[in-house]
């Protein structure tokens, strides 16, 4: 059995950035778990295209308008505003300053802003055509500099430890739900262990692999959504899955993605 203050399930950009923010308190013990043998292995690592920043002719209001328009009336206005206002500054603070990600620049040393579908401004930052790999490498290196962050590999989260979900007393079903960590499957030892935590963060990525055709890697199978549902979380809009529209359809090239940047710069079928 393991124990920590904060347990983060998933080591992609969401889990890694959460850990870096929380680790500012040196007394806080944080454990990140990943089912992969290598902490670099995540959906983030496979992203070829870029990430949204804030260009010189851009604003939070313009980005918010683009997000809501692309969402066709379904996106949460509150969540969209948080993303539009807080996302680009955090990109600079965490990815550039803390993780040292070297986004592409032009001959003058200024950021090279790219354009992608549904964006009214050039606001996409790239690292060549391997942006995700560069972000993953930078974040992993940053995590390793914190002595209060531990990364556990080859550990698959099976279920959340919740009260009263796992209680033997039937009357506990009337009590409020609380999460106390996760059951983890040790892929090397072939055994399930309890990992207790005061706070549990689900950062498990997507679910593309539940579909026959996808550009997602094998790990994107919806584990986090399933665990959250079993624990009593409300799952909404799960039917809205965005499929990457450009991929290489060739024998032996299953799920080989063609970057959205190709279309953003004017390519067409």
Predicted regions span which residues?
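Residues forming the flavin
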Residues: 1-65, 128-269
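Helix-loop-beta segment of a Rossmann-like dinucleotide-binding subdomain
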Residues: 73-77, 110-137, 208-212
């Amino acid at each position: 059995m393991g124990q920590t203050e904060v347990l983060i399930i998933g080591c992609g950009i969401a889990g890694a950035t959460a850990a870096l923010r929380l680790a500012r308190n040196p007394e806080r013990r944080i454990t990140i778990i990943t089912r992969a043998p290598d902490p670099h292995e995540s959906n983030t690592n496979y992203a070829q295209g870029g990430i949204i920043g804030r260009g010189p002719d851009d604003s939070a209001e313009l980005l918010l308008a683009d997000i809501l328009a692309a969402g066709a009336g379904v996106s949460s206005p509150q969540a969209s505003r948080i993303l539009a206002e807080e996302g680009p500054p955090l990109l600079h603070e965490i990815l550039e300053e803390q993780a040292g990600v070297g986004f592409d620049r032009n001959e003058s040393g200024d950021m090279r802003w790219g354009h992608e579908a549904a964006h009214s401004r050039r606001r996409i930052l790239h690292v060549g055509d391997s942006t995700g790999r560069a972000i993953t490498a930078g974040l992993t290196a940053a995590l390793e500099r914190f002595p209060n962050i531990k990364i556990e590999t080859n550990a698959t989260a099976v279920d959340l430890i919740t009260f009263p979900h796992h209680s033997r007393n039937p009357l506990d079903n009337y009590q409020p739900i609380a999460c106390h960590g996760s059951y983890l499957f040790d892929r090397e030892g072939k055994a399930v262990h309890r990992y207790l935590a005061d706070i549990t963060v689900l950062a498990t990525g997507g679910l593309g692999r539940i579909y026959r055709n996808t550009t997602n890697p094998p790990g994107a199978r919806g584990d986090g959504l399933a665990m959250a549902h079993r624990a009593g979380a409300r799952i909404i809009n799960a039917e809205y899955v965005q499929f990457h529209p450009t991929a290489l359809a060739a024998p032996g090239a299953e799920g080989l993605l063609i970057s959205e940047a190709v279309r953003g710069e004017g390519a067409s079928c």
